[in-house]
Amino acid sequence: MENKAYMYVLECGDGSLYTGYTTDVQARLKKHQAGKGAKYTRARLPVTLLYQEEHPSKPAAMSAEALFKKKTRQAKLAYIKERTQNA
């Protein structure tokens, strides 16, 4: 059985959104904040965690990330708002 994985969304210092996946959100966030994450976020510090979503496996989280990245910024924010209000 595979471990749980997460799709996460960061808000960058320039207001842009970054989407990724990981098995440990807090450790990954610390890497991004330390400038050791993705090249995209290194150039746009500071970053804050805007949203995280649990998935049953890494492939499921990767699939969710790919689908999320296809959305417009407005659709991404609406998706996050809808899920965080119902939590």
Swiss-Prot record:
Domain of life (superkingdom): Bacteria
Q: Name one Pfam family in it.
A: GIY-YIG
Which PROSITE patterns does UniProt cross-reference here? GIY_YIG (PS50164)
Q: Give the GIY-YIG domain ranges.
A: 3-78
Family membership, please give it.
Belongs to the UPF0213 family.
Protein name as annotated: UPF0213 protein SSA_0709
